[in-house]
Amino acid sequence: MRFSGMDMKGINMLFAAIPSICASSPKKISIYNEEMIVARCFIGFLILSWKSLGKTFKETLDGRIESIQESLQQFFNPNEVILEESNEQQRLLNLWISLRICSTVKVVESLPAARCAPKCEKTVQALLCRNLNVKSATLLNATSSRRIRLQDDIVTGFHFSVSERLVSGSTTLVEASTVEQIREAFLLEPRDLIREGFIVLRKVRVGGIPGTCGDGVGL
């Protein structure tokens, strides 16, 4: 049975008035009603405690009921509980990995090597450029030496060819002038060099060099 606010107030006033009435009664009534006084005082204490501590008890009971319900839910639905725990562990793992990556990046950025990286890069670039220049110079020297060797081989070949074409009775002046003309031709560019060489060789073959006859015999 529920009581309204006014009824509860009246009941409290009644319980508060009973001890005073019993205390003001004659001695026999007071002794006779000692058990009733104790019972009524205990009831009044319970009412006052319920008013002051009822909210705390209610919150405690609600929390206990909620925990019991969660335990029952975990007991009847273990898969959902395991899935939630797995998601929570995965979230914590991702958070831990992110924090570790951030700390690693911070440590790497704070290292002296990271500050010296631009200088090292410039040093590497300088070494590469120097090696490239050395290789280019070596290639140019090799090309020049091969060109000189080729010129010497061509001069030697023309010299032997002219010597075979000229007869033994030709003058030394004609042979010397022919070889000198060939050597002067090799001072030109490679294209002009080949052209002049063929001209000299043609003159030697047809006997067009001054001081020689058509059959290659000196005049």
From Swiss-Prot:
The chain crosses the membrane at residues 29-49. InterPro entries: ATP_synth_Bsub_B/MI25 (IPR008688), MI25_plants (IPR044988). Keywords: ATP synthesis, CF(0), Hydrogen ion transport, Ion transport, Membrane, Mitochondrion, Transmembrane, Transmembrane helix, Transport. One of its GO terms (cellular component) is mitochondrial membrane. It comes from the Eukaryota. It is a single-pass membrane protein. Pfam families: Mt_ATP-synt_B (PF05405). One of its GO terms (biological process) is proton motive force-driven ATP synthesis. One of its GO terms (molecular function) is proton transmembrane transporter activity. It is found in: Mitochondrion membrane. Belongs to the ATPase protein MI25 family. This is one of the chains of the nonenzymatic component (CF(0) subunit) of the mitochondrial ATPase complex. F-type ATPases have 2 components, CF(1) - the catalytic core - and CF(0) - the membrane proton channel. CF(1) has five subunits: alpha(3), beta(3), gamma(1), delta(1), epsilon(1). CF(0) has three main subunits: a, b and c. This is ATP synthase protein MI25. It comes from Zea mays (Maize).
